[in-house]
């Protein structure tokens, strides 16, 4: 580990093999907390490469507990967190809409590390048992249409990294690696990242890991979602290649808004926002943000021919009551 750290602090890139070796040392408890902190900080300051992220993600995936839902197609839907915008849980809320529209979701996430409320926090506040066994999660995906894979249970080796990440309190490569380690091995993914500079390298890593259809998105406000506040950079995986472009809310008939309109709070506050959106009570920018992100996921999962068609399907799904019923079904299934 010392040799790898020496290379990083000089600003030199690691090979894929060196990254894999470092990750093996970290996830087996052979690296000290000081070494892990140095590794994460030096890598962040240098900037992570495609080879480094691929190597780190491959080892993390190999150590994960997995599920294999018996459904034809399913999607993972996740943000990296660490965007420091303190928005409500857009991707988590959107996941219920996507599932209710008929596209199963195998969602992987954690409690908050570098934000006010992670997916685990809001789902727990909604009444979901986030500590459900893998068999229960798998059945949830198959019967309810959505399951939540709580990172500490599905990536137990992360226990060596968690305390260091919490103490550092800054974005690290593990914000990126979490979504890439999806224990369901989803072939379709919508991943939000906190910097437009990361979309292509993350899309390339996803292709290296077997993702066939996907989008990596980052708002110009550094939101790790498709944003309503301005342009979003999109790197789309389709037909074995990555295409990068930008989209705006206006393209889809949605109104641009200030980031303040999308703010949330802790798990309890965000849970109420999620309920209000799924029940149809919330009709403002928060709802439109969910429609936009759910629409993109439905497009990626081939439930819609375009993002615009996906948005229309998402709106219809909420208005029919199906989205809030899916939330209620998940709560019941995970607590049975």
Residue ranges: model-predicted function:
Residues 79-84, 109-115, 154, 220-221:
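Acidic, glycine-rich active-site loops and adjacent beta-strand->loop/helix elements
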Residues 40, 88-144:
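A glycine-rich phosphate/pyrophosphate-binding beta-strand-loop-alpha-helix module
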Residues 33, 85-92, 113, 284-289:
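Short, conserved micro-motifs enriched in small and acidic residues
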Residues 1-87, 101, 105, 256-262, ...:
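Acidic, glycine/proline-rich low-complexity segments that act as flexible tails and inter-domain linkers
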Residues 7, 62-65, 87, 102, ...:
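Glycine-rich anion-binding loops and their surrounding alpha/beta cores
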Residues 38, 93-97, 289, 293-296:
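Short amphipathic alpha-helical face segments that pack within enzyme cores
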Residues 13, 83-84, 111, 120, ...:
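Gly/Ser/Thr-rich beta-alpha loop segments that engage phosphate groups in nucleotides
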């Amino acid at each position: 580990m010392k040799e790898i750290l020496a290379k990083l602090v000089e600003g030199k890139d690691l090979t894929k093999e060196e990254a894999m070796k470092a990750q093996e040392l970290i996830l087996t408890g052979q690296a000290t907390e000081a070494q892990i902190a140095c590794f994460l900080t030096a890598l962040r300051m240098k900037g992570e490469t495609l080879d480094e992220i691929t190597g780190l993600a491959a080892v993390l995936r190999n150590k994960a507990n997995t599920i294999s839902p018996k459904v034809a197609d399913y999607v993972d839907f996740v943000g990296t967190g660490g965007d420091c915008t303190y928005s409500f849980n857009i991707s988590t809320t959107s996941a219920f809409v996507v599932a209710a529209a008929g596209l199963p979701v195998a969602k992987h996430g954690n409690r908050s590390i570098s934000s006010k409320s992670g997916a685990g926090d809001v789902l727990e506040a909604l009444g979901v048992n986030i500590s459900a066994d893998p068999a229960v999660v798998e059945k949830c995906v198959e019967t309810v249409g959505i399951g939540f894979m709580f990172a500490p249970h599905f990536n137990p080796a992360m226990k060596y990294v968690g305390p260091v990440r919490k103490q550092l309190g800054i974005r690290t490569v593990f914000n990126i690696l979490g979504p890439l380690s999806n224990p369901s091995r989803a072939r379709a993914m919508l991943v939000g990242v906190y910097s437009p500079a990361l979309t292509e390298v993350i899309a390339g890593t996803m292709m290296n890991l077997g993702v066939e259809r996907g989008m990596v998105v980052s708002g110009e406000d550094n939101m790790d979602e498709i944003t309503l506040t301005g342009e979003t950079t999109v790197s789309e995986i389709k037909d074995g290649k990555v295409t990068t472009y930008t989209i705006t809310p206006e393209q889809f008939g949605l109104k641009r808004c200030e980031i303040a309109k999308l703010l949330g709070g802790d798990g309890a506050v965000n849970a109420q926002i999620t309920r209000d959106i799924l029940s149809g009570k919330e009709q403002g920018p928060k709802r439109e943000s969910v429609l936009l992100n759910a629409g993109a996921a439905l497009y990626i999962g081939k439930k819609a021919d375009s993002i615009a068609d996906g948005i229309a399907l998402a709106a219809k799904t909420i208005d029919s009551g199906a989205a809030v019923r899916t939330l209620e079904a998940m709560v019941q299934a995970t607590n049975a």
